[in-house]
């Protein structure tokens, strides 16, 4: 009987904890992110998915201007004056896939030849889209028993457009 009371008290405590904590939002696996590229440079839409990606790392580089005015008693003031977005990708070279082939085909390109458009569809439904340049860093390679690698950076070229997820 004592064990039953203890079990019931524990269950009640757990139920109360869940009730008290409230909604903490959703979590999603990284593979729910989708990345699209325009395979005609900047003349079309970013509607071709890039297949074979295993990892991505977004990085925002902020330009910060710092100054130390005399009236701040030696404390530094800061202002973010610009930003840049880099999406680093690594994955497998998937021959025959339009998005993967397009990216790998830019390995020797420079200038206008590596300009494109991108769209990042996040698990929440939000999107980030805009102009970009593509820097292929590893078009293939690996150990003899590995699958060919594809690594590249997608760098924003101007301010991308963020569209929040629609609330349903």
Regions found by a protein language model. Name each.
Residues 1-34, 163-168:
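Short, intrinsically disordered N-terminal pre-domain segments
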Residues 139-168:
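C-terminal or internal capping secondary-structure element at the end of a domain, subdomain, or sheet
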Residues 85, 117-118, 150-153:
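Residue-level detection of beta-strand scaffold positions
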Residues 20-94, 131-148:
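Solvent-exposed edge beta-strands and adjacent loop segments
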């Amino acid at each position: 009987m004592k064990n039953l009371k203890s079990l019931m008290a524990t269950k009640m405590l757990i139920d109360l904890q869940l009730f008290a904590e409230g909604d903490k939002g959703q979590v999603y696996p990284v593979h729910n992110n989708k990345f699209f590229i325009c395979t005609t440079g900047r003349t079309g839409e970013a509607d071709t998915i890039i297949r074979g990606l295993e990892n991505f790392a977004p990085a925002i580089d902020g330009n910060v201007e710092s100054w130390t005015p005399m009236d701040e008693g030696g404390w530094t003031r800061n202002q973010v004056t610009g930003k840049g977005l880099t999406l680093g990708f690594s994955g497998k070279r998937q021959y025959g896939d339009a998005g993967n082939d397009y990216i790998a085909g830019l390995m020797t390109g420079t200038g206008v030849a590596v300009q494109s458009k991108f769209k990042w569809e996040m698990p929440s439904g939000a999107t980030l889209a805009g102009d970009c340049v593509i820097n292929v860093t590893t078009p293939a390679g690996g150990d003899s028993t590995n699958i060919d690698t594809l690594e590249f950076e997608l760098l924003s070229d101007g301010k991308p457009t963020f569209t929040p997820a629609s609330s349903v």
